[in-house]
């Protein structure tokens, strides 16, 4: 990309004006999107206006439409809800209201509108756009605007961002606010679990979501619920008997509690509502269990946005500004959405149409079609949930393969969830599943035992590694490992862990030349806070670590804001991989994030200090700088702290914080629980097929490259890649992949921190069509 093209982004908005509004129900992460729209808009040279109180503010005008400044969006990232206010507006539904709204925009020269809201808000925006020409004609005839004003504002560009906790909008894998709502729900479920266990109770939890079962479904996966009721898939006619049998079976197997999740719009096959109270009465009457109902209500909309929602809001906000400024009269109104980890632009009305089709299909009781229209991600969640929850473990081991599961590397949140789903899917398939304690060391020493269904009960929400994990690699113990593979008749190996799990896999591949016993299929599930395993864009555990860092940064920023003129330097984990520092920097609103992948010099440090000196002259008198632990062996945290302290004398003082091992701990986030559960299920399904494929002359013999893989999330799909193929893509000295997708987000971090850089800011999301996306491979 040429310097001229880089520079073009900085002048793209000159002479243009953008208005941003939040409409409909609030959602955590909306503020991150508003902040990004304002700052990137200003960066491109445009004027940006807040529209307070949603469409109502657009109709009423006056003080509701105010110009935004860089500082006016400071300290917004960590706040829930929407700072600029939202309202459900009747006036805008009438043409008269839209006429007043058009008048208010034209008078201010605003021709670009960014709407953050649900499907209703976005449909309203599209109607407004299609009527724009007629509205201007009417205003001109009435003498409210001049011909020149009408000419200047001849067309209106509209871009939508989907902000809704329900995740009910077709065309995007995740809407802004969904992940945070799941955080609130899971916090409550975890808290309820302890009291339910104490009293051997059954809890019926009602979650929000209107006519969409996404929150209920993912909650069930993330907490291992006994049953879930969602509107898209009503239960069979005899569901009362099935439910009661399921609950009593769980108790018979030794469980002290039952959790039932109900979506607020849950219905039966005849379209009749299934309420929490109905279910409670049923359980009490038929089983006599002590049963309680908890309706979660508006708690789900509140609280601090999760790291995921802050990053999603920021990325979508940046892309929205670019889509608006690149728009022409012929460009359709679009929605910026997420597919896998890719930002994409989709025609707004195509998405709205599919969303309406879901409602129509459900009203007409075409539930299978409604499920399909929700998309691949929803379908996958449902398939995995059904597998794990609605099957009785077989009494006999019909498949009778023996698969061992182990953890390797450093402990990380979500490992236990992956072990649980691997073990249970294995048992459902009729296999014998063994668990190995303490990684490859335990495999060599024979620390191996058989796992039954109840062995992994309640593991989903527990942090760390219950099996125990070591960084030891297998090479030195091939003799003992081979002996134990024979002794325990291990025919497949599921390795859950970080970079050591991957290098261990490579060593097993090498060892096959000498030891026939090692010729068994194995699969590596990446699980590490560092997110540095080649072959996967995400690792289990990284999201939990990111949220821990974020929470700490919020508290530190609060302290700095109270003290005034203070800069905090925070050291994050990650080895040589800068993922945590970069993403936490984006989520916490850091001024800089130093990482190994982007070499920096003393001049860069000087620029950062000068930038902070300038910042202290504004109303925002605090600074936050993140440093990855191994970003530079000479520019250490102490060095940077000393440099900042010296250079900032009299202007600001500095403090440093090394976060350390708290980043590995804690209860896994909903995203990590869900991701780990799906990865475990996918890995075990692959394993059964691979063992069958490798079965020759009464024994397993697998020596092809594709019998040893890493299961990874790549853009929009879960893929199995042979470890030998990934070798070329790995920087072994620094334990990182040679190419990392998140590096393209670094410019956004710098622009949002007000650096005058000539860098390409957009992710260049192309306009796709929803039909093409549906047939794509979005699997998570």
From Swiss-Prot:
PROSITE patterns: PHOSPHOFRUCTOKINASE (PS00433). It catalyses: beta-D-fructose 6-phosphate + ATP = beta-D-fructose 1,6-bisphosphate + ADP + H(+). Residues 391-401 are annotated as: Interdomain linker. The active site is at residue 166. Glycans are attached at residue 530. The keyword tRNA processing does not apply. GO terms for biological process: canonical glycolysis; fructose 1,6-bisphosphate metabolic process; fructose 6-phosphate metabolic process. It comes from the Eukaryota. The modification N6-(2-hydroxyisobutyryl)lysine is found at residue 557. GO terms for molecular function: 6-phosphofructokinase activity; ATP binding; fructose-6-phosphate binding; metal ion binding. Its cofactor is Mg(2+). Beta-D-fructose 2,6-bisphosphate binds at residues 471, 528-532, 566, 573-575, 629, 655, 661-664, 735. Catalyzes the phosphorylation of D-fructose 6-phosphate to fructose 1,6-bisphosphate by ATP, the first committing step of glycolysis. Belongs to the phosphofructokinase type A (PFKA) family. ATP-dependent PFK group I subfamily. Eukaryotic two domain clade 'E' sub-subfamily. This is ATP-dependent 6-phosphofructokinase, muscle type. The gene is PFKM.
